[in-house]
Amino acid sequence: MHLVDTHVHINFDVFAADLDQLQHRWRQAGVVQLVHSCVKPQEFDQIQSLADRFPELFFAVGLHPLDAEDWQDNTAGQILAYAKADDRVVAIGEMGLDFFKADNRDHQIEVFRAQLAIARELNKPVIIHCRDAAQTMRQVLTDFQAESGPVAGVMHCWGGTPEETQWFLDLGFYISFSGTVTFKKAEGIQASAQMVPPDRLLVETDCPFLAPVPQRGKRNEPAFVRHVAEAIAALRHVPLETLAQQTTTNARNLFKLPVPA
């Protein structure tokens, strides 16, 4: 059984002491490929070094909405240059909108649209962070696609209702679920995980955050994506192997990941 963890942050300091053991555990859990997200372009060299160390690691480059104030006149050029510099860059992101306690919504939208344009130019998918912003996100994506054409991508660590989920499915996006789908009170997320079409479903950890049950409260890590897959398989009443195969195929289709030899 093979799994792809489509969203990790193993460059964070919390992993520095045991990266080799981390790899051993994710391989034991069946994880054969990972997509490393990027919070800001300055992380690029560090993430690239991790991909040199771990051949199953692919990565993105972009600016997180919580860091939107760091956007400078040269940031778009940096992202473009980094994305062109390495074939292992499979996406632009993570980008998006985070309106939880935000007082810079208009600026976040500007930065988000700028990164959508980069992805469109490079024909790469986007990794989207959306928190407390689903309606605005829907409008921004709808407007951008009407103006510039379709952009592929994934709504990562998805926490929306089934109605909101359908909005982004209709826009052509994949939906990725994290450890939150295992939480007892996450009925809305669980309902969304049940209704996503099989060919648009992805799994992730978003490690080191949001460890799934039964590891909740611990540092999250890529091996725990198996718990996410098990929970979604149970919700959808399908064998784990079926869900693993489908989500792995989906990840490779979206991110154009090679099939390991």
UniProtKB/Swiss-Prot annotation:
Its cofactor is Zn(2+); Co(2+); Mn(2+); Ni(2+). A divalent metal cation 2 binds at E94, H129, H156. The enzyme activity depends on the nature of the second cofactor. Enzyme containing simultaneously Zn(2+) and either Co(2+), Ni(2+) or Mn(2+) exhibits high activity. Enzyme containing two Zn(2+) is poorly active. A divalent metal cation 1 binds at H7, H9, E94, D206. GO terms for cellular component: cytosol. GO terms for biological process: D-amino acid catabolic process. GO terms for molecular function: D-tyrosyl-tRNA(Tyr) deacylase activity; DNA nuclease activity; metal ion binding. It comes from the Bacteria. InterPro entries: Deacylase_DTD3 (IPR033665), DNase_TatD-rel_CS (IPR018228), Metal_Hydrolase (IPR032466), TatD-like (IPR001130), TatD/YcfH-like (IPR015991). It is an enzyme of class 3 (hydrolase). It catalyses: a D-aminoacyl-tRNA + H2O = a tRNA + a D-alpha-amino acid + H(+); D-tyrosyl-tRNA(Tyr) + H2O = D-tyrosine + tRNA(Tyr). Negatively regulated by excess Zn(2+). Catalyzes the hydrolysis of D-tyrosyl-tRNA(Tyr). Belongs to the metallo-dependent hydrolases superfamily. TatD-type hydrolase family. DTD3 subfamily. PANTHER family: D-AMINOACYL-TRNA DEACYLASE. This is D-aminoacyl-tRNA deacylase. It comes from Synechocystis sp. (strain ATCC 27184 / PCC 6803 / Kazusa).
